[in-house]
Amino acid sequence: MIKLQNKGVTLQGGVPTPAEAVFPAGRDKTMAYQILRRHDRPCGDGSMHLTFDSLISHDITYVGVIQTAKASGMTEFPVPYVLTNCHNSLCAVGGTINEDDHVFGLSAAVKYGGDYVPANQAVIHQYAREIMSGCGRMILGSDSHTRYGALGTMGIGEGGPEIVKQLLRNTYDIAAPEVILVWLTGQPPQGVGPHDVAIALCGAVYKNGFVKNKVLEFAGPAVSQLPMDYRIGIDVMTTETACLSSIWETDDAVAEYLAIHGRPETFTALHPQDGAYYDGMITIDLSRMEPMAALPFHPSEAVTLRELIHDPGDHLREVEKRAEAQFGGKAGLHLTDKLVNGKLMVDQGIIAGCAGGMYDNIAEAAAILNGHDTGSGYFSLSVYPPSVPVNLELMENGVQQSLLASGALFKPCFCGPCFGAGDVPANNGLSIRHTTRNFPNREGSKPSDGQLAGVILMDARSIAATARNHGVLTSAADVDYTPPAPVQRRFDRNVYDRRVYFGFGHARPDAPLKYGPNIAEWPAIPALADDLLMQVASVLRDEVTTTDELIPSGETSSYRSNPLKLAEFALSRRDPDYVPRAKATQVLEASRAAGAVPPALAEVLRSLDLPESALARMHIGSVIFANKPGDGSAREQAASCQRVLGGCANICYEFATKRYRSNCVNWGMLPFTLAEGAAFDGDAGDFVYVPGVREKLARGDEEFPAVLVHKGKAQPITLYLKNTSAEERELLLTGCLMNHYAAQNRR
């Protein structure tokens, strides 16, 4: 189905051809570089310094973004900035705090000149597709699934501080990325949907890092054969491959989509130029695709549904082993209990949001369920359309009525099932979902309370087939159904014109920001000291640590407008002792600053053979060790929560994503790495001493000799800060992005 070629490729006469040599200049002929160059402010340093046509955030990120930008000197939004309300839109946790955030968001749109999309009108990425996309554009979003490549728009998802930089008229700085050609051939068989293709792609490239921090460029004869919703459904899942961004060839289907959405002038035909050079190629033969499943706990745990249905026991036992390895005795997952007479019984089906909720997916699900029902047992099916305009189409064409008659439930335009804020399964429940992720606990369970559930990612088509079989896992390839007849798509913009606040270009500086009692300013962040003494607050030896583990989503997201309250939940579902340990380190630092030397600190000084006078040059903070932290969400709070608890660094072998590393840097946490194969023997409570860290960082050193104090004994280790730009070093020296810009404003 999928072939990887880890060698250079050029397009010659529209045909991929092995490149005889590396030809970086040929990247300028790719669609990606044609767009990137137009958005670059070159500084002669070989990096790209990008500006964006528009920005977008949702209601669990925009408060922090605006608070940071305000503290950094922002007076108005210089580019279109859209604030959507699709994550905490249930307003079901914490009393008034969620709606308080929404009120704050509207007041910020009025004051600074932004656009505000009220709750339940649209999920963030569907609104961007319908209203903001256009060929050759670039959009930066504070959500990792900011992907609009199928519409000719390069989307990048980053943490909130990168949005802040754009609001302050600065740039998004990256090394010039490699580009991977994704060559599509064939036509997918009936019953195979975009999520099947996406899961297979994730399975092929995630674990080997084949596309990490690269741009995926989709081309080939099959592109023109795919409907727009199909392309969009594949594209949004490219985030799960760890790539930087994506772009697709554009054609008449894209032109029609943009025209239907009232923006025909934003269409431009995009194609690679002859001689375009790619750093590798992925060939996908769609005709050989099968319905797929991504087992817990990652979209890359790909297996064909055919295999899973034929031999469920072995696959489920592997999942149980992964759960046992991660959660130990805190919570158990016993999915083999779901086997009844050799068949796998699932408890719940969800079709939702920016990946699953598109019109075509829901219409196909309705066709599969037509004349059937979901049963009256434990299994339930819920459908979340991505926007009110799409929901109106589903109603007008009878799709919604058909699904309701079959026993499915329609719910608001809401991202909840994707991050644990809606339709949380029962303990030991098994949910099949056409959503973006199935990380541990992302469905909402709490291992610290003995809860655990599992999510298998599947396409809407096979979810509907399973619903038709009353919860018995079923592939859409194994059911007979008549696909829905093509319909003339339409878009009713009046929905938005009547409800959305369009404020760009109409800032009202005298208008007040409206604060609820939970919305708090960022606490003071210290600058980097001459020497650094770090106490290990958590050691995470899992292969990968996700941002969902670093700061859980779900109901805790309601507290993201209050940095100190939110920090209480840091690592709560992975290492509940992290917060108490980090706070204990803060007490040590407070004692040092007051001139006291507690016994624990005196013991560390003896191990390091340092006099008490060395404390005057030192800062004491906490540090997390993880093998590979930062997969998943763009949420800056994965880093900021550590920072407000006194965190000053991460130590790892590599960062899972560029965006998490950027979040650490923007919050002033040193992104230390270890050499491949180097041991880190530290345990929670141990110390790491980095002498001269400020001086070395200021002069651009990459190697930082350090000392690990483990069980009272000092042992040398070497930490690295590689590929750190001059601006990143300045942010780290000043303590965080806010401090950096505040200092600039004072000058």
Located regions from the model:
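Fe-S-dependent hydro-lyases/dehydratases of central metabolism
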Residues: 1-747
